[in-house]
Regions:
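Short glycine-rich or small-residue beta-strand-to-loop segments that form or flank ligand, phosphate
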Residues: 2-8, 63-67, 164-170, 278-284
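Glycine-rich phosphate/diphosphate-binding loop of Rossmann-like nucleotide-binding domains
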Residues: 4-26, 130-202, 214
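N-terminal beta-loop-helix "entrance" segment that forms/cooperates
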Residues: 30-52, 206-208
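Glycine-rich phosphate/nucleotide-binding loop
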Residues: 39-42, 207-307
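Short, glycine-/small-residue-rich phosphate/pyrophosphate-handling segment
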Residues: 99-125, 139-143, 259-292
């Protein structure tokens, strides 16, 4: 099968090469179609995404991307925003779990964030009323709420999760977040075997840094989902351990959500774990569950052993050496 690979900026090319090597070692049979995108490509070409990229994604329905930067200034929109809008990837999935061997405050985090990906304040509807007043529109619709809540409960049912928690601020945003919460409760009634509750966003942030193990699946509107995704990544060591999947009806785009780290680009210092875990998510959705499980197990075992790991988790290994160590475990 074919899939699009977008290395992106900075360390992207190095960690994308890790994916290619692991994919070959697992005998996935994936034919990678590589396209350039990001600030570096824009500096060379004046375009943020290489011609043919979007058509290739549409044709095959699968893509994996590294970190991409958006040039500062007018004329460029975020690549992630463009991809979400073009392919209507309405759900952003962020599994977060503790990795033995990565020093953190908690050793029992295992939760999943389901973020609505298409509306809310991120719809980008904002304007100046005059020179001193700016206004932004928080757009929430019942169809989008129902779709993301149903996705969260279906995910919980399929993956043996026991509880889904709605994240909101309906005590203040009574119409917009109120609509989200009402829709969540309506959908929850169709899944009686799954516990459904809700938590106000500010209280949730406090509880996450006190006792994160009390949560299982969190479903949230766009803005809150963005905030808690990074917060939860911090609970397990940072964005270097946080894979992501953007899911639409006919297209799925997987990514490492950390930065492009231009200060270490080209130096064989990058940690490829996030993009390898994103690749494991992709394999799982492709039905290659055994290969996905093998890859995740190899990563966890390598990190837990702690001998051949990258500098950000206390080791001295480079990107290539770490990748080869993971492959050896496969």
């Amino acid at each position: 099968m074919k899939a699009v690979l977008i290395p992106g900026d900075g360390i992207g090319r190095e960690i994308a090469e890790s994916v290619r090597e692991v994919s070959a070692a697992l005998n996935t049979g994936i034919e990678w179609q590589e396209f350039a995108a990001g600030a570096e490509y824009a500096a060379e070409s004046g375009e943020l995404i290489a011609p043919g990229t979007l058509d290739a994604i549409e044709a095959c329905g699968w893509a994996l991307k590294g970190p991409t930067a958006t040039p500062i200034g007018k004329g460029f929109r975020s690549i992630n925003v463009q991809l979400r809008q073009r392919f209507s990837t309405y759900a952003n999935l962020r599994p977060v779990h503790t990795l033995p061997g990565v020093p953190t405050r908690f050793d029992n985090v295992d939760l999943v964030i389901v973020r609505e990906n298409t509306e809310d304040l991120y719809k980008g509807i904002e304007y100046m009323l005059n020179d001193e007043i700016a206004n932004g529109v928080k757009l929430i619709t019942r169809p989008a709420c129902e779709k993301i809540c149903r996705f969260a409960f279906d995910y919980a049912r399929k993956n043996g999760r026991k509880k889904v928690t709605a994240v909101h601020k309906a005590n203040i945003m009574k119409l917009t977040d109120g609509l989200f919460l009402r829709t969540f409760r309506e959908v929850a009634a169709e899944y009686p075997e799954i516990t459904a509750d809700d938590c106000i966003i500010d209280a949730l942030c406090m509880k996450l840094v006190q006792k994160p193990e009390q949560f299982d699946v969190l479903v949230a509107p766009n803005l809150y989902g963005d905030i808690i995704s990074d917060l939860c990544a911090g609970l397990v060591g940072g964005l270097g351990f946080a894979p992501s999947a953007n899911i639409g009806d006919s297209t799925r785009i997987y990514e490492a959500v950390h930065g492009s780290a231009p200060d270490i680009a080209g130096q064989d210092k990058a940690n490829p774990i996030a993009i390898l875990m994103a690749f494991a998510l992709m394999l799982n959705d492709l039905g290659e569950t055994d290969k996905a499980a093998k890859l995740n197990a190899a990563i966890l075992a390598q990190v837990e052993e702690g001998k051949v790991v990258t500098a950000d988790i206390g080791g001295t290994a480079g990107t290539k050496e770490f990748t080869q160590a993971v492959i050896a475990r496969l």
